[in-house]
Amino acid sequence: MKRSDKYTDDYIEQRYESQRPHYNTYYQPIGKPPKKKKSKRIFLKAIITILILLIIFFGVMYFISSRANVDDLKSIENKSDFVATENMPNYVKGAFISMEDERFYKHHGFDIKGTTRALFSTISDRDVQGGSTITQQVVKNYYYDNERSFTRKIKELFVARKVEKQYSKNQILSFYMNNIYYGDNQYTVEGAANHYFGVTVDKNNSNMSQISVLQSAILASKVNAPSVYDVNDMSNNYINRVKTNLEKMKQQNFISESQYQEAMSQLGN
């Protein structure tokens, strides 16, 4: 082979090699961006921290509320004008249950459905009843009346459960109706009935006239704002609350259709 031929072949081979595609045979792992991993870890740590704080918070609230002696509620029965619910006409009890806690006999101190319904009523301007159950209100009025805070609501829940375990529903309702403010320095349903209408809620008391369906609805509708609602000069808002209460009493079978119609005619609006 001629030397010139060799150079020619080498040139052709080099040119061929330069035109061939080259592939990277080394494995290069592609990882996730480090920022994503870091943000995920931060998020998980935040969730775990929040859960731990909530557990600690509710644990502390439970400990504090466990110190409340629910035996003390029995002292309400020592009031001179205390009347137990079993000695009242059924419609008197019904007036308060319908207005304040219509699921009273179905829950165990806290009512998720009732709270949700109350929230909806507030949003839609149909404020018919509060979000707290009657049991919670018993606890608030007796133990935490002067306390206004979110933690009070949590303590209420725990103490309300204790109250429900120790007392019957009728006892709890008696505590409620005999330890709330009706206005004009009246704190029992018997005292309020005597003061405003000259009647009694005690069906065994033959010395006074018995409270009527309408009068029961008026008192039950008053406790939401006792200093605002005036029995002797009823505002339109107060009248509408009484009407709503009477309707609910009928729906829940605390009064008959004829009792409802009679009360509505006596209301006269």
Swiss-Prot record:
GO cellular component labels: outer membrane-bounded periplasmic space; plasma membrane
Transmembrane segments: 46-66
A Pfam cross-reference name: Transgly
Reactions accelerated catalytically: [GlcNAc-(1->4)-Mur2Ac(oyl-L-Ala-gamma-D-Glu-L-Lys-D-Ala-D-Ala)](n)-di-trans,octa-cis-undecaprenyl diphosphate + beta-D-GlcNAc-(1->4)-Mur2Ac(oyl-L-Ala-gamma-D-Glu-L-Lys-D-Ala-D-Ala)-di-trans,octa-cis-undecaprenyl diphosphate = [GlcNAc-(1->4)-Mur2Ac(oyl-L-Ala-gamma-D-Glu-L-Lys-D-Ala-D-Ala)](n+1)-di-trans,octa-cis-undecaprenyl diphosphate + di-trans,octa-cis-undecaprenyl diphosphate + H(+)
GO annotation terms (biological process): cell wall organization; peptidoglycan biosynthetic process; regulation of cell shape
Organism domain of life: Bacteria
Alphabetical keyword list: Cell membrane, Cell shape, Cell wall biogenesis/degradation, Glycosyltransferase, Membrane, Peptidoglycan synthesis, Transferase, Transmembrane, Transmembrane helix
EC number: 2.4.99.28
Enzyme class name: transferase
A Gene Ontology molecular function term of the record: peptidoglycan glycosyltransferase activity
SUPFAM superfamilies (alphabetical): Lysozyme-like
Keyword Coiled coil: no
Pathway linked to the protein: Cell wall biogenesis; peptidoglycan biosynthesis
InterPro entries assigned to the protein according to its UniProt record, in alphabetical order: Glyco_trans_51 (IPR001264), Glycosyltr_51/Transpeptidase (IPR050396), Lysozyme-like_dom_sf (IPR023346), Monofunct_glyco_trans (IPR022978), PBP_transglycosylase (IPR036950)
Membrane topology: Single-pass membrane protein
NCBIfam families documented for this protein: PRK13481.1
Record's protein name: Monofunctional glycosyltransferase
